[in-house]
């Protein structure tokens, strides 16, 4: 199983940016934690972080050709603005879980709307880095469940 983890703008500044909201743990720590859990579950995980909307769209489109089973995406600020990312996700038709470190529904009014949630199978928010692990497990369970269903 192959899962792509995409992180949007400013997530490379985890541990530096607004630690009262996002904590003091760094982006490198996040990647290490996800890799550890993925390795236990024998899942291949690839990571991508960009501050640029077009590069995120390009990566989503490449995921189609690279045959990823799932995408975990934290679009960060693009959550609330990017129809382009929504359209890219819809076009590749890959199982997608949206993740947010903070609970966007408890933040400023403009952060409460998510375009990505219009496509994502589920949204996990407010659980910190654990949300990524929950997303990983969600995709694993969904894909494995689909395979078992197809085998019957």
Where are these regions (language model features)?
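Extreme N-terminal starter segment of soluble prokaryotic enzymes
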Residues: 1-4
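Glycine- and acidic-residue-enriched helix-capping/strand-helix junction motifs
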Residues: 14-28
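Short beta->alpha junction loops
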Residues: 46-54
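Short, electropositive alpha-helical surface patch
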Residues: 55-71
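Short, hinge-like loop/turn segments at secondary-structure boundaries
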Residues: 63-65, 89-91, 113-118
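Mid-chain, well-packed structural core segment of small domains
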Residues: 67-105
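Short beta-strand elements at the ligand-binding edges of bilobed clamshell
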Residues: 110-129
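A charged, well-structured terminal subsegment
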Residues: 125-152
């Amino acid at each position: 199983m192959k899962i792509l983890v995409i992180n949007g703008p400013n997530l490379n500044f985890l541990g530096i940016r607004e630690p009262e909201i996002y904590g003091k743990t760094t982006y490198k720590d996040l990647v290490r934690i996800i890799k550890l859990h993925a390795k236990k579950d024998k899942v291949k995980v690839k990571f991508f972080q960009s501050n640029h909307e077009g590069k995120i769209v390009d990566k989503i489109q490449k995921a189609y050709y690279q045959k990823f089973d799932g995408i975990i995406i934290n679009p960060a600020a693009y959550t609330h603005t990017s129809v382009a990312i929504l359209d890219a996700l819809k076009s590749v038709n890959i199982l997608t879980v949206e993740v947010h470190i903070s609970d966007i529904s408890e933040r400023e009014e403009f952060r409460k709307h998510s375009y990505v949630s219009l496509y994502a199978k589920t949204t996990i928010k407010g659980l910190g880095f654990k949300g990524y692990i929950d997303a990983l497990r969600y995709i694993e369970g969904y894909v494995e469940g689909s395979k078992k269903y197809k085998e019957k």
